[in-house]
Amino acid sequence: MGKYFGTDGVRGEANVELTPELAFKLGRFGGYVLSQHETDRPRVFVARDTRISGEMLESALIAGLLSVGIEVYKLGVLATPGVSYLVRTEKASAGVMISASHNPALDNGIKFFGSDGFKLDDDRELEIEALLDAKEDTLPRPSAQGLGTLVDYPEGLRKYEKFMESTGIDLEGMKVALDTANGAATASARNIFLDLNADISVIGDQPDGLNINDGVGSTHPEQLQSLVRENGSDIGLAFDGDSDRLIAVDENGEIVDGDKIMFIIGKYLSDKGQLAQNTIVTTVMSNLGFHKALDREGIHKAITAVGDRYVVEEMRKSGYNLGGEQSGHVIIMDYNTTGDGQLTAIQLTKVMKETGKKLSELASEVTIYPQKLVNIRVENNMKDKAMEVPAIAEIIAKMEEEMDGNGRILVRPSGTEPLLRVMAEAPTNEAVDYYVDTIADVVRTEIGLD
């Protein structure tokens, strides 16, 4: 991570940390860096989610892009993976998404995609950061015909929807409950599943700029669980604010997380001989029960650091086609280059339809170990140094010794927020509470803000 870029772009409280001034500079400097090798006029696609700050930051970002001669295609409200898809298939120079994903409405973020549809690598981000930190802006300032132009491109949304539909099958007879988080999926998920002939019900589809992720979506699936039970739905599908992740709910109203979703899709692909190298890429946060289920099926796993960008890096490097995170980021590289909640939802319903199995039956093949995650608010400059605090390092070592290999502990900084995350897995809820609470108490005493 750099000074400005975290694991998922630049994020902060809108108009306080992520200001219009910074958005303008990101547009100007980011656009310049990403268009250096273009022979024709560069084209950049820009989209946003439904946050009230989105239009403010969009306007500033676009102004910065136009100031270095870039032709900007304004997509409006669109899922993050929609930007990735359109950049790649329409041969644009780059794409930019304005969103803070699952964060609350007061936050926002800006992330860039290269011409290949992948998120920027560290080197490109450092180039942009160097320009941000320069004492003087020495970039060219074209005038008249050298300035960029702005093109409204609402048809991009429908192109993404049609692509999504092309990856699925007819869902006639399937009752699907959708929670679009009052976010970007509001613009597309309903249309996609209607076109696939599903019998749908929808919540979280009334965005007002302030209610994105507020009690709805993949981080708050309780309303969706109730809806599934009340309506007798076959499946519930909860997206986050920018629709790059999915959490599912089975017909009994039980949560099916990213680990179980990856297992279901991975086993389906493996059985068909379509899982590249018979391997799923996952992170250190994946559940031990997921690992055991993969071992039982003879499916290999590759483990990365937390963050979908690291999953994607490993997939690209080694030629894998399925990977993701417990949080619901699932990357299906046969179709798209980034986590895509709606694509994942379509593939999950396809497995149900083709196998004739209920989601609960498919998910029951993974027995999840009790896991507890506690977020502790700390100073941003301390979250990466926590393990250097002797008392914290000592208590973690003590708890790991007590586990004696029957469980695990993971303490790591958030890539996007001023938080230290303490996670443990163990055979019982009582044990996992003990391990996490003991460590968390020491962290709070030593460096916590609350």
Swiss-Prot record:
GO molecular function terms noted in the UniProt entry: magnesium ion binding; phosphoglucosamine mutase activity; phosphomannomutase activity
Keyword terms of this UniProt record: Isomerase, Magnesium, Metal-binding, Phosphoprotein
Catalytic reaction(s) noted: alpha-D-glucosamine 1-phosphate = D-glucosamine 6-phosphate
Gene3D superfamilies membership: Alpha-D-Glucose-1,6-Bisphosphate, subunit A, domain 3, Alpha-D-phosphohexomutase, C-terminal domain
Modified residues (Phosphoserine): 101
Ranges that cross the membrane: none
Binding positions for Mg(2+) per the UniProt entry: 101, 240, 242, 244
Cofactors demanded by this protein: Mg(2+)
Post-translational modification: Activated by phosphorylation.
Catalytic residues identified in the record: 101
Highest taxon of source: Bacteria
Top-level EC class: isomerase
Cofactor: record remark: Binds 1 Mg(2+) ion per subunit.
GO biological process: carbohydrate metabolic process; peptidoglycan biosynthetic process; UDP-N-acetylglucosamine biosynthetic process
EC numbers on record: 5.4.2.10
GO cellular component terms, A-Z: cytosol
InterPro entries in alphabetical order: A-D-PHexomutase_a/b/a-I, A-D-PHexomutase_a/b/a-I/II/III, A-D-PHexomutase_a/b/a-II, A-D-PHexomutase_a/b/a-III, A-D-PHexomutase_C, A-D-PHexomutase_C_sf, A-D-PHexomutase_CS, Alpha-D-phosphohexomutase_SF
Protein name, as recorded: Phosphoglucosamine mutase
UniProt organism field: Streptococcus agalactiae serotype V (strain ATCC BAA-611 / 2603 V/R)
